[in-house]
Amino acid sequence: MAVSSAFVGCPKLETLLNHHNLSPSSSSSSSVSQTPLGLNGVRVLPKNNRTRRGLIQKARCELSASSDSASNAASISALEQLKNSAADRYTKERSSIVVIGLSIHTAPVEMREKLAIPEAEWPRAIAELCGLNHIEEAAVLSTCNRMEIYVLALSQHRGVKEVTEWMSKTSGIPVSEICQHRFLLYNKDATQHIFEVSAGLDSLVLGEGQILAQVKQVVKVGQGVNGFGRNISGLFKHAITVGKRVRTETNIASGAVSVSSAAVELALMKLPQSSNVSARMCVIGAGKMGKLVIKHLMAKGCTKVVVVNRSEERVSAIREEMPGIEIIYRPLDEMLACASEADVVFTSTASETPLFLKEHVENLPQASPEVGGLRHFVDISVPRNVGSCVGEVETARVYNVDDLKEVVAANKEDRMRKAMEAQTIITEESTQFEAWRDSLETVPTIKKLRAYAERIRVAELEKCMSKMGDDINKKTTRAVDDLSRGIVNRFLHGPMQHLRCDGSDSRTLSETLENMHALNRMYGLEKDILEEKLKAMAEQQQK
């Protein structure tokens, strides 16, 4: 049986067909003859096949291969093969939103830093993910506390497998190790998770505001990127709305600390109380995190800080914004010299390799006696800026983002109460988002119903014009054309009204979906919709 040209140049579709034995070569007469016939000439798969994972989850039936069907087999298109096969679930059923992630709650920083994807690489990652056989859309949320991949998957099981293997390939971490630390969430659970993340409920520091800015950045970077499609972009845009609403309508952000402020608190906890103000402070990196560290040091009474950065421009801007603290700029090549004169060194750069190693630190002079001669490195970067080997130096103490749990463990009861306030909003917004996704299902039917009516209109108009002859003037032609369009639009008005729904009312949505299925059956639109999905998949694969 020849495969339709619709599949040519679409490896993803060909892979689906071949993987699930849907290619012509897979349907040999010998395999058919070995399968016993059931009632009414229906061929039932053997019992041991009924429990097979993947596509065959329920007993499936195949029509017996009669001589008539065999003679007609060559005329069946590839589309009809797919519609009558197990692969139909990939195109007829709604795809799933899936989260494959590792966070500070499930994986150590040593693993997260290997998985981290710089923001500049997000578009490339989205393109690679959408090139996988069972992935339609994708987004990456990579921060110091989490590495999460959001996808729209044709198949949950196979999509997760492909993404996990991709993560292993890009990070060098074995699949088995990733599986030990990853978490998987599907559809409603995935929706609730990103809403909780955006609201600051899943952060190490409850209610911290930086994560909302990071979610916004996912949308900003994703705009115009093939693969950051309607479902995933809609999910993240709704998550931004949730994050704003939670912070506006609850007091979750009141008194909340950020990762940077927690880092300052941790450093002060480790210093003798008498030296909290006099300790010499150095901040490596003048980005958002570094700026917040300086801000919180000033709030704690620090009057002087040395800031090491690649350029002086950002440091000057911070100096103007914070006149209450003396900020001394030093270039990056003086980093070790600055560290040798500091008691506490905060690191917050985007460097993908450590800035401080054991050989850099072991020859530095001891910190001042006021802090016990110990130099404290507080590293809030992922990947880490301070190698774990620095902790082997007798006069050095190293802390990373995972150590901030010691700071935020306090006030647990207050954190839980604030989280409960936010959960009410998140539950409400999750329901609205799922309803919006449901309402999207009617869009293909609306398009195909209009196209169906337009084909009939054009065909009948051509018949009418041919009967009227060549001597018809332009005015009459235009009038007849307008008449045909008016009739079609009036005829479609009622069905279209019953197909449009914003998802805000569950009862209305249910009725809308019933109307959609009825119209699909009456006008045979499912085949057209399926063809459109196949075409979209082919185009996505070719990009």
From Swiss-Prot:
Regulation: Negatively regulated by FLU and heme.
Region named Disordered: 20-44
UniProt miscellaneous comment: During catalysis, the active site Cys acts as a nucleophile attacking the alpha-carbonyl group of tRNA-bound glutamate with the formation of a thioester intermediate between enzyme and glutamate, and the concomitant release of tRNA(Glu). The thioester intermediate is finally reduced by direct hydride transfer from NADPH, to form the product GSA.
Site feature location: Important for activity: 193
UniProt domain comment: The N-terminus (65-92) is required for heme inhibition, but not for activity.
Class of this enzyme: oxidoreductase
Protein name per its UniProtKB record: Glutamyl-tRNA reductase 1, chloroplastic
Gene: HEMA1
Alphabetic keyword roster: Chlorophyll biosynthesis, Chloroplast, Membrane, NADP, Oxidoreductase, Plastid, Porphyrin biosynthesis, Transit peptide
Cellular component aspect of the GO annotation: chloroplast; chloroplast membrane; protein-containing complex
Cell compartment(s), UniProt: Plastid, Chloroplast membrane
InterPro entries: 4pyrrol_synth_GluRdtase, 4pyrrol_synth_GluRdtase_dimer, 4pyrrol_synth_GluRdtase_N, GluRdtase_CS, GluRdtase_dimer_dom_sf, GluRdtase_N_sf, NAD(P)-bd_dom_sf, Shikm_DH/Glu-tRNA_Rdtase
Native source species: Arabidopsis thaliana
Annotated function: Catalyzes the NADPH-dependent reduction of glutamyl-tRNA(Glu) to glutamate 1-semialdehyde (GSA). Probably involved in the tetrapyrrole synthesis required for the chlorophyll biosynthesis.
E.C. code: 1.2.1.70
Catalysed reactions listed for this entry: (S)-4-amino-5-oxopentanoate + tRNA(Glu) + NADP(+) = L-glutamyl-tRNA(Glu) + NADPH + H(+)
Low complexity bias: start-end ranges: 23-33
